[in-house]
A protein has these predicted regions:
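Active-site substrate-binding loop specific to GH73 endo-beta-N-acetylglucosaminidase modules
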Residues: 2-10, 77, 84-88, 95, ...
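Flexible, low-complexity segments enriched for small/polar residues
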Residues: 6-24, 29-40, 267-298, 307-509
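Exposed alpha-helical structural elements
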Residues: 27, 43, 52-56, 60, ...
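N-terminal accessory alpha/beta regions
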Residues: 27, 31-35, 39-148, 460-472
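Generic alpha-helical secondary-structure signal
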Residues: 31, 47, 59-60, 161, ...
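Short, solvent-exposed secondary-structure capping/transition elements
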Residues: 41-44, 115-116, 131-136, 171, ...
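Intrinsically disordered, low-complexity coil segments
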Residues: 49-56, 68-71, 223-225, 260-265, ...
Length: 509
């Protein structure tokens, strides 16, 4: 983990808007792009009028906690014979068909469900499984359901349930872990990746002894891809010593001992990952320590840690805004939600699933057991052009479907703070600069500080045939004047979006 080198010195005290540090569009997008997958124009306007970030965070988290899990598909508990019979009846219904269907459902949930699904995606990259290893689409569906159930719940319960889930048992060879041939894979990853961190608070002896305590989850009643159950005859029924505690430990004991004996290490490791994902890749150890204490105080409930973080001065510090490179899901789904794209002629869910896969983020199927590393991995040269053109595809589809919606989006857009108001149709002539500034601040997390780049963006917005340069002059008068109520503003906004896609700051959130 990188030491804290950031300039963000703010604390976890609650952020309260003030004239010196107002609640504005930038902070609203910062919250929604981190805690969810972007905000619609209506949601931004509502958040701005509320002027109470703490209450907004509580509402978003409360909604996530109250949300029902996604209903399982008809095939969510099929075994291998069921899938083979379905494929025999229809050649198109092979395993990849069901996997795509499950992933499309996740993408649809990411679009709609904000906080719960943001955490579901986060945990899928923490408790990693790969569908090409366990193969069963039903296991994938059950795993996804488990992520949703525990996304904001109790982390100790999460660790318990994930370790004996069908997908994880197969993925990390728990289903091969028997008394005379203990398999150490899951025991190692339980500590190294899921709870403690690499070489942090455990020994090789702890791994070996833990693997014995985890034996026995191997029984499928001879049903391929059926539920994997505990078989006491395959359990290592002997004394084991884990973290200095000796006894004839089994699965339940491992979890209890881990959280009793390594409480602070577990809390710190998980909170450091939450911090890196939601605030900055550069760790602030003092802030993480406070988050960890909140985690412990609340008996490893996840939601209180999130409430504390997302309400804090630290989270809304300018150094935290625009500090993270967008993942493919961030890039595509946030833009989709923020622009309010609605194209009845396109299967948006399938398009987004396939696009983020091509860009390196195949949902429910990270690249390896350590998951997607993110950050600069997302913008390697071979992926960057694909990121640009995928966003352009969305822009062009929206334009071809309803160009008028482009002007409608601009009209009424908030300028910055509630006191500054919204873009209204009375704007004309040189007031075009107000529109450009509002759009730049809306789509770039920290605006554009480089004057040359900003002027280029402004030039692109202004440079259309309908509005010669004289239309923007202070002495311009009707009909030879730019006005926000003109239909050609749609073309200006289209040109603006097409241009900003290539600007490096657009890749940040």
């Amino acid at each position: 983990m990188v030491s804290d080198t950031s300039c963000n010195l703010d604390s976890l005290d609650m952020y309260v808007p003030s004239p010196e540090n107002p609640w504005n569009v930038s902070k609203i997008h910062h919250l929604y792009r981190r805690i969810g997958f972007g905000a619609s124009k209506a949601e931004v306007l509502n958040a701005l009028s509320l002027n109470n970030p703490g209450a907004l965070v509580d509402t978003l988290i409360d909604e996530a906690l109250a949300l029902n899990t996604t209903s399982p598909p008809a095939w969510g508990f099929w075994n291998r014979d069921d899938f083979e019979a379905a494929e025999m009846a229809n050649d198109d219904n092979d395993l990849s068909f069901y996997r795509r269907e499950g992933k499309n459902q996740m993408i649809n949930d990411l679009i709609q469900n904000k906080v719960r699904e943001r955490l579901t995606l986060f945990w899928s990259n923490h408790f990693v499984t790969e569908d090409r290893t366990y193969r069963s689409p039903a296991y994938q569906s059950q795993y996804y359901n488990l992520l949703q159930i525990h996304a904001l719940g109790n982390f100790r319960d999460f660790v318990y349930d994930i370790g004996i889930s069908n997908a994880m048992l197969v993925y990390l060879n728990g289903d091969e872990n028997v008394k005379n041939r203990p398999n150490e894979n899951y025991a190692r990853e339980l500590y190294e990746l899921f709870t403690l961190g690499v070489d942090n608070g455990y020994t090789e002896d702890d791994i070996q002894e833990t693997s014995k305590a985890l034996t026995g989850y191997v029984n499928t009643n001879r049903i391929p891809w059926g539920d994997i159950l505990f078989n006491p005859e395959q359990f290592s029924n002997e004394n084991k010593t884990i973290f200095g505690q000796s006894g004839n430990w089994g699965y339940d004991d491992v979890i209890n001992i881990l959280f009793q004996e390594r409480e602070t290490l577990v809390a710190t490791f998980i909170c450091s990952k939450l911090y890196a994902y939601f605030v900055s890749p550069t760790c602030n150890e003092a802030i993480v320590a406070q988050m960890a204490q909140t985690f412990i105080t609340n008996n490893f409930q996840i939601a209180p840690v999130l409430r504390q973080l997302f309400k804090s001065e630290h989270f809304y510090n300018q150094e935290a805004i625009g500090a993270i490179i967008k993942s493919p899901c961030d890039l595509m789904i946030c833009f989709y939600n923020e622009l309010g794209i609605n194209d009845p002629m396109m299967d948006s869910t399938d398009f987004l699933r396939n696009t983020v896969r091509v860009l390196g983020q195949d949902v429910l199927n990270p690249i390896d057991v350590e998951g997607w590393q993110g950050d600069e991995d997302w913008i390697s040269p071979d992926l960057l052009i694909g990121r640009w053109e995928s966003i352009r595809f969305l822009i062009n589809r929206a334009w071809s479907e309803n160009p008028e919606e482009f002007r409608n989006f601009v009209v009424g857009l908030p300028i910055g703070t509630a006191a500054e108001g919204n873009l209204d149709t009375s704007l004309s002539g040189p007031q075009v600069d107000i529109v450009v500034r509002a759009l730049v601040n809306y789509f770039f997390p920290r605006g554009i500080e480089d004057e040359v780049i900003y002027n280029e963006i402004s030039g692109v917005f202004k440079d259309i045939d309908a509005f010669p340069p004289t239309y923007y002059e202070p002495d311009a008068v009707d009909p030879a004047i730019w006005r926000l109520d003109r239909s050609e503003v749609a073309e200006q906004f289209y040109a603006f979006l097409d241009y900003i896609v290539d600007i490096p700051e657009f890749q940040l959130k």
